[in-house]
Regions:
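N-proximal low-complexity "stem/linker" segments adjacent to membrane-targeting elements
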Residues: 1-27
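Cell-envelope/extracellular polymer assembly enzymes that use nucleotide-activated donors
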Residues: 4-7, 35, 190
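A conserved acidic beta->alpha catalytic loop
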Residues: 40-49, 68, 92
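Glycine-rich, basic loop-to-helix element that forms the pyrophosphate-binding segment
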Residues: 66-83, 96
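Conserved nucleotide-sugar donor-binding catalytic segment
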Residues: 81, 121-123, 135, 139-233
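Short aromatic/hydrophobic "clamp" motif used to bind/position activated sugar donors
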Residues: 88
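Conserved donor NDP-sugar-binding/catalytic core segment of glycosyltransferases
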Residues: 100-135
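C-terminal subregions of glycosyltransferases and related glycan-biosynthesis enzymes
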Residues: 156-160, 185, 190, 197, ...
């Protein structure tokens, strides 16, 4: 059996309500050379019957019902281990491909840029009723970008500018390590950094995929439980250490927002992890006090200005600014 050019990996757990929408969006693609590998992690909502029906209709669909519940990250890695394509695209059971050109566009982006190890696009936001409620385009800079530069930008801005797995495409050869199970909330961002340490990043501003926001998401549950509270700082420390090993300097003053958040978390937590206290002390020793004081003053002024604008726009008879 010849290998497909793209492996679409769909890990799912209790998403029977959304699965048909996700699968139909794959079958509607204008790039037909793919396999759709679906791994159901012991769902209890009738997902198995839906998957069996689709697998019987299209030979490109392979479904596997896990004998035991693997958990989110282990299920992602199981899918990676089964992929046969040159390129890999994740699509979660509650998301969908928004454009019939999604596979072709992302694949072409990597094929046209051999130095790139990761491609992503803007994404539309769906609610639980499948209505489009927004657009996320945080990266806002189309084209090819240096991997290390993108890593540093995400850390400086303290957010995932790349997006969720459903909006990305990467080469299977670069992903042999898999997702790091030590991470939960930022497991995808850590993996993007792993790929970007191997190559460049291509960004497409068209919303090729859709990401759904609803309270049943595991990522939403993790956020509510603050599972990932310290993960950004752990990721920063690990990335900075690897950069230093390669002779790259990451001056602490370039990451003042991250240092500010770390300081806040340490002060608000009765017993911060020792590694986080050490990281805060290390960064504090490198940042001139006046530099940090100026940052805090600017932050305070921006907050005041934002509050004034909100009050003015809410005042009766006042047009929003």
């Amino acid at each position: 059996m010849s290998s497909p050019s793209i492996s679409i990996l769909l890990p799912t757990y209790n998403y029977a309500r959304f699965l048909p929408e996700a699968i139909e969006s794959v079958l509607a693609q204008d790039w037909p050379d793919f396999e759709l590998l679906i791994s159901d992690d012991r769902s209890t909502d009738g997902s198995a019957a839906i998957l069996a029906s689709y697998a019987a209709r299209d030979s490109r669909i392979r479904c596997h019902l896990q004998p035991v519940n693997l958990g989110m990250v282990a299920n992602w890695n199981w899918c990676l281990g089964q992929a046969r394509g040159e390129y890999v695209k994740f699509l979660f059971g509650d998301d969908r491909l928004e454009s019939p050109r999604a596979l072709r566009s992302l694949r072409d982006a990597l094929a046209q840029h051999p130095s790139a190890s990761l491609a992503a696009s803007a994404r539309s936001i769906l609610n639980a009723e499948s209505a489009l409620v927004g657009l996320w385009d945080e990266f806002q800079d189309a084209g090819l970008h240096s991997g290390p530069t993108v890593i540093q930008r995400c850390l400086r801005e303290t957010r995932n500018l790349i997006g969720e797995p459903s909006v990305t495409l990467f080469r299977r050869r670069d992903a042999a390590r898999g997702f790091d199970p030590r991470y939960r909330q930022l497991v995808d961002l850590e993996f993007w950094f792993h790929l970007l340490e191997q190559g460049d990043f291509v960004y497409l501003p068209e919303p090729l995929c859709s990401f759904r926001r609803h309270t049943a998401q595991q990522s939403e549950q993790h956020a509510i439980a603050e599972v990932g509270k310290w993960e950004l700082f752990e990721l920063f420390a690990a990335s900075r250490a690897r950069a230093a090993q390669q002779g790259q300097s990451w001056p602490a003053h370039q990451f003042l927002p991250l240092y500010h958040h770390l300081t806040h978390h340490c002060r608000q937590t009765a017993t911060p992890p020792p590694a986080m206290q050490s990281l805060r002390q290390e960064l504090a020793a490198e940042i001139p006090p006046l530099h940090y004081a100026a940052f805090r003053a600017r932050r305070h002024l921006r907050s005041l200005a934002h509050g004034i604008r909100r009050r003015l726009s809410a005042a009766p008879g006042t047009a929003p600014a």
